[in-house]
Curated annotation (Swiss-Prot):
Species: Protochlamydia amoebophila (strain UWE25)
Role noted for this protein: Single strand-specific metallo-endoribonuclease involved in late-stage 70S ribosome quality control and in maturation of the 3' terminus of the 16S rRNA.
Gene name linked to the record: ybeY
Main location, first listed in the record: cytoplasm
Cofactor(s) essential for the protein: Zn(2+)
Compartment(s): Cytoplasm
This enzyme's EC code(s): 3.1.-.-
First-level EC class: hydrolase
Binding site for Zn(2+): H112, H116, D122
Keywords, in A-Z order: Cytoplasm, Endonuclease, Hydrolase, Metal-binding, Nuclease, Ribosome biogenesis, rRNA processing, Zinc
Cofactor notes: Binds 1 zinc ion.
Superkingdom of the source species: Bacteria
Protein's name in the database: Endoribonuclease YbeY
Length: 150
């Protein structure tokens, strides 16, 4: 599977390499039996995620990730899945308060964003449970492969 993954690390809160990013993204897409040609991923600081949250959701509080699916052009053979903005600082804070690994938490936020791009939703309770199950399934699989953002 050839997928162009455009990634940008625009934050300095959590030091990590983007080396595993391609493999993580491809594993999730493949396990979901989806296809795409391109996905854009940005790791951003708290100020940036708050601005995006305010601009698009009228909420100026920090959040874990924000996903923007691309409109599907049925006539185009090239499929851009969308854009994901992940905030590692949110992962650090959550991980510290729950005795978790911030790298695993950041990976979870990436998986969460990918699932949103592939049509999962978490606003209604039933959808939330379905999405949570998918997150657990993917994180378990990635853990077996030792694939985390680190």
């Amino acid at each position: 599977m050839i997928v162009i993954i455009n990634a940008s690390n625009e934050q300095h809160d959590l030091k990590f390499s983007l080396a595993n990013l391609d493999a993580i993204v491809k594993e999730v897409i493949q396990k979901e039996q989806q296809t795409c040609d391109e996905v854009n991923i940005y790791f951003v600081d708290t100020a940036t995620i708050c601005k995006l949250h305010l601009d698009y959701f009228n909420d100026d509080t920090p959040t874990d990730c924000i996903s923007f699916p691309m409109d599907k052009d049925e006539n185009s053979p090239y499929k851009i899945l969308g854009e994901i903005f992940v905030c590692p600082q949110t992962a650090i804070e959550y991980a510290l308060s729950h005795e978790l690994d911030p790298y695993e938490e950041t990976t979870l936020y990436l998986v969460h964003g990918l699932l949103h791009l592939m049509g999962y939703d978490d606003l209604e309770e039933n959808d939330f449970l379905i999405m949570k199950e998918a997150e657990i399934r993917h994180m378990t699989h990635l853990k077996k492969l030792e694939l985390y953002i680190k």
